[in-house]
Regions:
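Bacterial N-terminal signal peptides
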Residues: 5-16
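N-terminal leader/linker segments that initiate helical-solenoid repeat arrays
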Residues: 19-42, 47-51
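Amphipathic alpha-helical scaffolding segments comprising HEAT/armadillo-like alpha-solenoid repeats
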Residues: 28-41, 62-74, 94-106, 128-138
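Short inter-helical turns and helix N-cap capping residues of alpha-solenoid HEAT/ARM repeat scaffolds
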Residues: 45-46, 77-78, 109-110
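Conserved hydrophobic register position within alpha-solenoid helical repeats
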Residues: 53, 85, 116-117, 121
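Eukaryotic acidic, Ser/Thr-rich intrinsically disordered low-complexity regions
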Residues: 117-144
Length: 144
């Protein structure tokens, strides 16, 4: 009996999460209060909070966070936090953000951080090339 109840609960949970992820209007508006809270979190002394804020700023592609994230990438002593900042900069994707990631490949003292930055920059360039190839294909097909 316990086995059947467990299977039922797991199936219900699976169905709920499947339908919950299909909501296209999950995040439609990002309030200024949210952005300022995340940017303030970058100045916290709590390492976990800083990492989480950097991650969310990247996920939300908040371009006003580029300068504080660049500062973390250049100056912070913690490798994990610098990697989180580099990932956020990669996700934001502005030319200034991508350039900061590119420069960290050459100038960061940590080989681990440099390798992660190289991976992020490689993905950026690969996606850029794919987009250019798609555009070229569309132009060529439209001219036929």
């Amino acid at each position: 009996m316990k086995f059947l109840v467990t299977i039922f609960l797991l199936t219900s949970l699976l169905i709920e999460t499947s339908y919950a992820s299909g909501n296209p209007k999950a995040i439609t508006e990002i309030r200024q209060n949210t952005i300022s809270s995340l940017e303030n979190g970058l100045n916290s002394k709590n390492l976990g909070l800083k990492s989480s804020c950097a991650y969310m700023l990247g996920e939300l592609r908040i371009s006003t966070a580029v300068i504080p994230l660049m500062k973390i990438l250049r100056e912070n002593e913690n490798e994990d936090l610098r990697i989180a900042a580099a990932l956020a900069l990669y996700k934001i994707g502005t030319p200034m953000a991508i350039n900061a990631v590119k420069q960290s490949i050459r100038f960061d003292n940590s080989e681990r951080v440099s390798k992660h930055c190289a991976s992020f920059y490689y993905e950026h360039m690969k996606n850029k090339l794919i987009d250019e190839e798609k555009n070229d294909y569309v132009v060529k097909t439209a001219r036929k």
